[in-house]
């Protein structure tokens, strides 16, 4: 996954940011900026939700500071097979659905995570859009 650097003041609601601490991509839910003080600079308070895990974070930075923004690669593909896996987590074992997706341009097969809200729509033969966020994630399913 490629990242570019932008200033915090250039970000808008709906943009994506890359958090280096946990290596996840977050979607910005809200941004509030404060006025600069007599000797200070304007600050931005960013609330964001992880695209893969749903974790919520709050970042407070000066608007002139740099922040990493991911260049999201979108892949059109077709589901070949799905598989349920048990993954350890802090709440115990969690069941995760992974889909084998064939890229319709290169015919390469990749494994992509399937979010909770799309688990019932995913079936072999369905066309999908996969976002490469460091970890491939199915973001949209098209029924035939």
UniProtKB/Swiss-Prot annotation:
<dbReference type="InterPro" id="IPR012340">
    <property type="entry name" value="NA-bd_OB-fold"/>
</dbReference>
<dbReference type="InterPro" id="IPR014722">
    <property type="entry name" value="Rib_uL2_dom2"/>
</dbReference>
<dbReference type="GO" id="GO:0003743">
    <property type="term" value="F:translation initiation factor activity"/>
</dbReference>
<dbReference type="GO" id="GO:0045901">
    <property type="term" value="P:positive regulation of translational elongation"/>
</dbReference>
<dbReference type="GO" id="GO:0045905">
    <property type="term" value="P:positive regulation of translational termination"/>
</dbReference>
<dbReference type="GO" id="GO:0043022">
    <property type="term" value="F:ribosome binding"/>
</dbReference>
<dbReference type="InterPro" id="IPR048670">
    <property type="entry name" value="IF5A-like_N"/>
</dbReference>
<keyword id="KW-0963">Cytoplasm</keyword>
<dbReference type="InterPro" id="IPR022847">
    <property type="entry name" value="Transl_elong_IF5A_arc"/>
</dbReference>
<feature type="modified residue" description="Hypusine">
    <location>
        <position position="38"/>
    </location>
</feature>
<keyword id="KW-0385">Hypusine</keyword>
<dbReference type="GO" id="GO:0005737">
    <property type="term" value="C:cytoplasm"/>
</dbReference>
<keyword id="KW-0648">Protein biosynthesis</keyword>
<keyword id="KW-0396">Initiation factor</keyword>
<comment type="function">
    <text>Functions by promoting the formation of the first peptide bond.</text>
</comment>
<dbReference type="InterPro" id="IPR019769">
    <property type="entry name" value="Trans_elong_IF5A_hypusine_site"/>
</dbReference>
<dbReference type="GO" id="GO:0003723">
    <property type="term" value="F:RNA binding"/>
</dbReference>
<dbReference type="InterPro" id="IPR001884">
    <property type="entry name" value="IF5A-like"/>
</dbReference>
<dbReference type="Pfam" id="PF21485">
    <property type="entry name" value="IF5A-like_N"/>
</dbReference>
<dbReference type="GO" id="GO:0003746">
    <property type="term" value="F:translation elongation factor activity"/>
</dbReference>
<comment type="similarity">
    <text>Belongs to the eIF-5A family.</text>
</comment>
<dbReference type="InterPro" id="IPR008991">
    <property type="entry name" value="Translation_prot_SH3-like_sf"/>
</dbReference>
<protein>
    <recommendedName>
        <fullName>Translation initiation factor 5A</fullName>
    </recommendedName>
</protein>
């Amino acid at each position: 996954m490629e990242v570019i650097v932008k200033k915090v003041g250039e970000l808008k609601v709906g943009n994506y940011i890359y958090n280096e601490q946990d290596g996840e991509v977050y979607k910005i839910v809200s941004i509030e900026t404060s006025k600069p003080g007599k000797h200070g600079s304007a600050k931005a308070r960013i609330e964001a939700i992880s695209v893969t895990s749903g974790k919520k974070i709050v970042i407070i930075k000066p608007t002139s500071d740099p922040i990493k923004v991911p260049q999201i690669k979108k892949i059109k593909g077709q589901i070949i097979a799905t598989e349920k896996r048990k993954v350890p987590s802090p709440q115990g074992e969690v069941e995760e659905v992974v889909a084998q997706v064939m890229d319709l341009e290169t015919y390469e097969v990749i494994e992509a995570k399937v979010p909770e809200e799309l688990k019932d729509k995913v079936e072999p033969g369905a066309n999908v859009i996969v976002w490469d966020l460091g970890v491939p994630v199915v973001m949209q399913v098209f029924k035939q």
